[in-house]
């Protein structure tokens, strides 16, 4: 492995941590309806005998600010989808209406909003830990490259500086995502 490969692999690992944070945040409820709230929900489809993501089973739309409309491609999956929503941690009550499901999004209480902000912050910390883990692995690899005489001492220092810059960049990106999500949650 050379220095360039190390930096590319490190950046890829850090990007995965940011993507993890984005995906986790999309599942956190804000006061308004969003397809991202339910699209990654795991649904056990009894007629197929497998577990699938909701976005692979239905069209998810938001016809009103506080309503999600779920229209399954296969009408036989309506009740499986309703059950998955009931069993999720979203605290939502799906209304099965023939071939579709209406999912009203109630307004959040102040206490619930604060709990959701705490949840988002803990998810963000988990993502930051992943970024720092990628940094530690990269720093160890940089030391190994120096020990194997692939890079000079100055090269190692430059590499460590670049790794730290990547770390700072992705931690800042996670912090910005948290700020946006917190604002979304606290907006009534």
Swiss-Prot record:
What GO molecular-function term can you cite, just one?
ribosomal large subunit binding
Q: Which domain of life is it from?
A: Bacteria
Q: Which UniProt keywords apply?
A: Cytoplasm, Protein biosynthesis
Record field: transmembrane? none
State the Gene Ontology BP annotations: translational termination
Principal localization reads: cytoplasm
Q: Where in the cell?
A: Cytoplasm
Q: Which GO terms describe its cellular component?
A: cytoplasm
| Pfam families according to UniProt | RRF
Q: Which PANTHER family match?
A: MITOCHONDRIAL RIBOSOME RECYCLING FACTOR PSEUDO 1, RIBOSOME RECYCLING FACTOR
Q: Which family does it belong to?
A: Belongs to the RRF family.
Q: What HAMAP family does its record include?
A: RRF
Q: What does this protein do?
A: Responsible for the release of ribosomes from messenger RNA at the termination of protein biosynthesis. May increase the efficiency of translation by recycling ribosomes from one round of translation to another.
Name it: Ribosome-recycling factor
Q: Which source organism does the UniProt entry give?
A: Akkermansia muciniphila (strain ATCC BAA-835 / DSM 22959 / JCM 33894 / BCRC 81048 / CCUG 64013 / CIP 107961 / Muc)
């Amino acid at each position: 492995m050379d220095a360039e490969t190390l930096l590319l692999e490190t950046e890829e690992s850090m990007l995965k941590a940011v993507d993890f944070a984005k995906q986790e945040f999309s599942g956190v409820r804000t006061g308004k309806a969003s397809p991202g709230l339910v699209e990654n929900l795991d649904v056990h489809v009894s007629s197929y005998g497998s577990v699938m993501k909701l976005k692979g089973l239905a069209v998810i739309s938001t016809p009103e600010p506080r309503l999600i409309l779920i229209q399954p491609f296969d009408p036989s999956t309506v009740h499986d989808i309703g059950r998955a929503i009931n069993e999720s941690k979203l605290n939502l009550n799906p209304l099965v209406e023939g071939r579709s499901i209406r999912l009203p999004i109630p307004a959040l209480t102040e206490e619930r909003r604060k709990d959701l902000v705490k949840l988002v912050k803990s998810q963000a910390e988990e993502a930051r830990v992943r970024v720092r883990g990628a940094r530690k692995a990269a720093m160890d690899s940089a030391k190994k490259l120096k020990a194997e005489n692939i890079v000079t001492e100055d090269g190692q220092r430059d590499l460590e500086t670049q790794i730290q810059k990547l770390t700072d960049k992705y931690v800042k990106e996670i912090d910005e995502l948290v700020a946006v999500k917190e604002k979304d949650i606290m907006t009534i």
